[in-house]
Amino acid sequence: MNLQSGQNIPLQQSTIRLNLQYPAKSGFKGEPDTCLFMLNAQGKVSGDSDFIFYNNLSSPEGAVRLVTGSQQASIEIALDRVPANVSKIAITVVIDGEDTISGLSLLSIQAPGIADFQAETQGRSEKAIILGEVYRHNGAWKLRALGQGFNGGLEPLAINYGVDVAQPAPQPAKPARISLEKKLETRSPRLVSLAKKASVSLTKNKLDTLEAAAAFVLDA
């Protein structure tokens, strides 16, 4: 059965296999990656281990497994082993690099013997797409086709689903160099001209690039 965006189909099997294909057009320099998010009733992951991707290929209990390949991936879901707090599993494809979804010549998901879905790629500017989802409904499981684009790459998508993404440590700020003239002007305006003369003298003698400690006795 060929699904259209928004359509769903019941899943009768206890274990399903999903095959994704995303061959790229000529000149495509990015790298498509399949990412899965095991979501609770609030649409968020309950922990970072519920984020299945190239660095974490299976869920802790082994209910969801991801196998990645060149411009393709396969997913195996043991529906009867999915934790009770997981309401749905979002199936996404993210482009790593400067390219977008429009750089793919095909973007499809197939459940052999059940259904398949092909998402539109032409003219799309998004770097990520929610291709479909496997979700609970009245005590059973269903597969829904989506093809919903998402602006941004993997990081904003993961954050949207509640993944705690590590941020790079900020670079320490360089200490500000205090202007001697400003300090003197605040405390003793009479010494401003002295500081200016000292600066001119250092420049003439090519010593202005050297740093040295100096002390001024300010007679209040």
List PLM regions with ranges.
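Intrinsic-disorder/low-complexity signal
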Residues: 1-220
